[in-house]
């Protein structure tokens, strides 16, 4: 059945597949091979990304290799609380979130976040604190399950979670977070250095936004892990990647025409899209991150500051 489900996911252009009870990197490698075979047999590009659910003691013990191999991580606290002592779950959650963002991989915190709202129109204070603390830990996303799948107040629970997230993000110390320098910056990785310095420049010039031109989404993910105060507008020409980037913290993806090969042409198109969307106005400063030549993957090597005309 798992093979049939993977074949269906590939054939249906599903963006992410979540794997339950991942024990080690080999589990992910095996599913990735199945995805590749299904892509070949269906004549589609192999673009499905894999999210590893950490919900067992063995998975937690091997979390570093799992994060390296997966495209994203889910902290599945329900089964985790059954598989290991309950008092270790909050500690594991914080550790996984930190490891995930340092690896520039999105982390989803899930299970029983607003559980009481299955039956009640308001959450408990403890549940509100649970959602807030996951956000303060810098999780990429928080996920509802039974609350919206079978609860009495599915719309209200989403609004409640949204309001908690908004309140936290108004209090989040983004500048202090930026001082937590990623390890690749210290070891000389050029794209990591460029992303870190782009955010530094954005703070120094009080930029309204970061605009990143990306072919693979990697540059946008590197910016996302730095949790900048200003939004990240990612411009790309691949529709599947456009959908997948929506999971990354602070990233708002946009599709551009993909016809421009000169930097100025693509930047002008990106700025025009932002102005039409009323995201940028005359006088706003933006920091632009790109790689030259534009069509070359993994070449992030340019930072530019522009004032919107």
Name each model-derived stretch.
Residues 1-309:
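Non-catalytic helical/linker scaffolds that mediate oligomerization, partner binding
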């Amino acid at each position: 059945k798992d093979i049939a489900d993977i074949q269906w996911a590939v054939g249906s252009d599903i963006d992410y597949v979540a794997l339950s009870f991942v024990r080690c990197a080999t589990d992910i490698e095996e599913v990735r091979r199945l995805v590749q075979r299904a892509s070949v047999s269906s004549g589609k590009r192999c673009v499905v990304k894999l999210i590893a659910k950490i919900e067992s003691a063995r998975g937690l013990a091997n979390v570093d290799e799992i994060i390296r191999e997966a495209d994203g991580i889910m902290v599945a606290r329900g089964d985790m609380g059954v598989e290991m002592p309950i008092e270790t779950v909050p500690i594991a959650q914080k550790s996984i979130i930190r490891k995930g963002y340092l690896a520039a991989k999105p982390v989803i915190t899930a299970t029983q976040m607003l559980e009481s709202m299955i039956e009640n129109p308001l959450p408990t204070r403890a549940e509100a604190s649970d959602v807030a603390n996951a956000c303060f830990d810098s999780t990429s996303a928080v996920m509802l399950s039974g609350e919206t799948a079978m609860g009495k107040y599915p719309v209200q629970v989403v609004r409640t979670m949204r309001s908690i997230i908004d309140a936290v993000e108004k209090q989040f110390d983004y500048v202090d977070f930026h001082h937590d320098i990623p390890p690749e910056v210290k070891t000389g990785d050029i794209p990591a250095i460029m992303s870190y310095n782009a955010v530094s420049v954005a703070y120094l010039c009080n930029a309204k936004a970061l605009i990143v031109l990306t072919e693979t989404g990697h540059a946008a993910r590197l910016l996302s892990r730095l949790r900048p105060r200003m939004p990240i507008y990612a411009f790309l020409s691949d529709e599947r990647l456009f959908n997948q980037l929506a999971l990354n913290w602070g990233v708002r993806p946009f599709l551009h025409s993909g016809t421009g090969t000169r930097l100025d042409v693509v930047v002008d198109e990106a700025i025009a899209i932002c102005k039409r969307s009323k995201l940028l106005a005359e006088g706003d400063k933006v920091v632009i991150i790109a790689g030259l030549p534009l069509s070359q993957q993994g070449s992030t090597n340019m930072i530019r500051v522009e004032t919107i005309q």
